[in-house]
Design a protein with these regions (language model features):
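Short, surface-exposed connector motifs at secondary-structure boundaries
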Residues: 1-2, 106-111, 133-136
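Phosphate-binding glycine-rich/basic clefts of nucleotide- and phosphate-handling proteins
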Residues: 2-83, 94
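Residue-level signature of catalytic and energy-coupling elements of molecular machines
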Residues: 18, 93, 115, 151
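Active-site phosphate-binding and catalytic loops of NTP-dependent enzymes
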Residues: 28-32, 97-105, 161-165
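Phosphate/ATP-binding catalytic cores across multiple sugar-kinase/actin-like superfamilies
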Residues: 81-108, 154-157
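Glycine-rich phosphate-binding loops at beta-strand->alpha-helix junctions
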Residues: 106-129
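Conserved phosphate-binding/catalytic loops in two-lobed NTP-binding clefts
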Residues: 127-153, 161-165
Length: 167
């Protein structure tokens, strides 16, 4: 690991962003399970998607009346709800790139950036980071297991990587 920047943003943060958005913009109280479904079905990192998902009916409790309520929500709304958290990810990427040694910067310029983890599967995140960095951005093959597999390979070959893992 040549340089790194850690940001405490994961799928749970996106889920909480959706819960907050539904409460403040629609006066609708939704639970984690519902917010997670919204994130998976229509979650987006940008309003500019090539093939956007259909609007989604979201059920919850009306905060004003206490009655059950249904609201139609678009992916554009969810992109707005997630915007601040995604900006934090973009800032971390830009900070990391600014600290990257020149030789590695050349490699990144030629090969691009690879995203891993569940958050990388958010629609348009690769496109948004690419627009911010002016670099190609790809989603890793099997993004949910990529980090674990990479860590496992490194641990199996610890002597090979020891020199670059210790700061």
């Amino acid at each position: 690991i040549v340089c790194d920047k850690s940001v405490k943003i994961a799928g749970d943060v996106f889920t909480n962003d959706i819960i907050y958005y539904m409460r403040t913009q629609h006066n609708l109280f939704v639970g984690e399970t519902t917010a997670e479904k919204v994130k998976i079905q229509i979650g987006a990192a940008t309003e500019d998607l090539d093939s956007p998902p259909e609007d989604m009916a979201v059920d919850g409790r009306d905060l004003l009346t206490g009655k059950p309520k249904r609201v139609d929500v678009s992916y554009r709304e969810i992109a707005k709800a997630l915007d601040k958290s995604i900006q934090r990810i973009e800032d971390a990427v830009m900070e990391t790139l600014s600290q990257t040694p020149p030789e590695l910067s050349a490699d990144i310029y030629n090969t691009g950036i690879y995203l891993a983890g569940g958050g990388s599967m958010l629609r348009g995140l690769d496109k948004r980071i690419s627009m911010k960095t002016d670099l190609p951005v790809y989603i890793a093959e099997d993004p949910l297991r990529a980090v674990v597999r990479g860590t496992g390979m490194t641990l199996k070959n610890i002597n090979k990587y020891k020199g670059i893992l210790i700061k």
